[in-house]
Structure formats: structure tokens, C-alpha cells
A protein has these predicted regions:
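A short acidic, leucine-rich amphipathic alpha-helix
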Residues: 1-2, 55
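Short amphipathic alpha-helical interaction segments
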Residues: 3-16
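Nucleic-acid-binding surface
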Residues: 15, 23, 27-175
């Protein structure tokens, strides 16, 4: 707002006058509006991609809304501000960060970066020790029943993450 000559004091007065609440650095919402935590997270970390539990829930692979919102960022990024705020942060090599990245419109009407279905399955398998076995199995089975699944894309992603063998084993057992 400095570019259009709006002073800090004017901004603070506007926030106070409109009873807004700070939800992140430079991010304010009206107190009578339900907070879109995934959107706030994507604004706090614009280079990150909403992932794991959030993506599983968005795609209907699990039926429980996540308790903790998840984001994936490149290795070397300092996630302490995000983890201190209660977010779960996953890291990948920089060259893998955009693999499977897409933009979705969530239930609040906000566009947020999120991984596609196949990348979400790869993340699930890579982080399988962090998931309850029932949720893990339900997500894999639900994915395999979907008409919009792309097993070829899944295997391309699996190769990039070096988890082809593991993915094949799950597919053989569950198909």
C-alpha cells in the first residue's frame, strides 16, 4: 500500500474501525467471518503447496477434516514461523516442489495451491508412518475406486520420488 501512498496509521485505523483480527503477518479478517485457514496458510507461505491431510480431505480420500493444516515447501526454507503457529510442514527437494502442483478453489471460494490426486497419493505413501493404518488404507482404496484416477501419472510421480516398488506393491494387493 506504500506504492499508493496509504500510511500505516490509515491501515491501522481501518483495521480497528472495522473490528478486524490479525490471523497472520499482514493478514486480517473480519471477526464475523469464518477463517479459511488453508488460504491463510497459502498467503503466509506463497512458495508452499497445501498438501497431505488437507489434500486427502479435499479429494474425499479421507472423511475427517484435518486437525492440523499441512504445507510442503522446498528443503532449505526455514519453517519455524509456520511450525510455531501450529502448521505441519513437509519439505522436498526444490526440483520436486512443483511436481503435481495445481490450483483448486476451496469451499470458501479461495484459490489455493494444492497437489493433484496422484501427487497426494505419493505424499501419503512417502509419509505413511504419520498416518493411522485405517486412514491410509481408506485413502488408497478410495483412490483406486475413482474414475478420474491416472495410474500412469501416479507411476511417473512415484518414479520421481523413488517409491515405484512400494506403490506397485500396494496396487497389486488392492487392485
Amino acid at each position: 500500500l506504500k506504492n499508493v501512498n496509504v500510511s500505516r496509521q490509515s491501515i491501522y485505523n481501518f483495521i480497528k474501525r472495522n473490528c478486524m483480527e490479525k490471523v497472520g503477518p499482514g493478514i486480517y479478517i473480519s471477526k464475523d467471518v469464518l477463517e479459511d485457514e488453508a488460504y491463510v496458510l497459502s498467503q503466509r507461505c506463497p512458495k508452499g503447496v497445501i498438501s497431505h491431510d488437507d489434500a486427502l480431505y479435499y479429494y474425499g480420500l479421507v472423511d475427517r477434516e484435518p486437525f492440523v493444516h499441512c504445507i510442503t515447501i522446498y528443503s532449505g526454507y526455514n519453517p519455524s514461523a509456520l511450525t510455531n503457529s501450529g502448521y505441519k510442514v513437509y519439505t522436498v527437494k526444490k526440483e520436486l516442489l512443483d511436481l503435481g502442483k495445481t490450483t483448486i478453489t476451496n469451499q470458501f471460494g479461495h484459490e489455493i495451491p494444492m497437489y493433484d490426486l496422484e501427487r497426494t497419493i505419493c505424499d501419503l505413501v512417502r509419509s505413511r508412518r504419520n498416518f493411522e493404518i485405517q486412514d491410509f488404507n481408506m485413502a488408497i482404496k478410495t483412490y483406486l475406486q475413482r474414475s478420474d484416477k491416472d495410474l500412469n501419472r501416479l507411476m511417473v510421480y512415484a518414479k520421481s520420488f523413488r517409491i515405484e516398488k512400494i506403490i506397485r506393491q500396494y496396487m497389486e494387493v488392492l487392485l
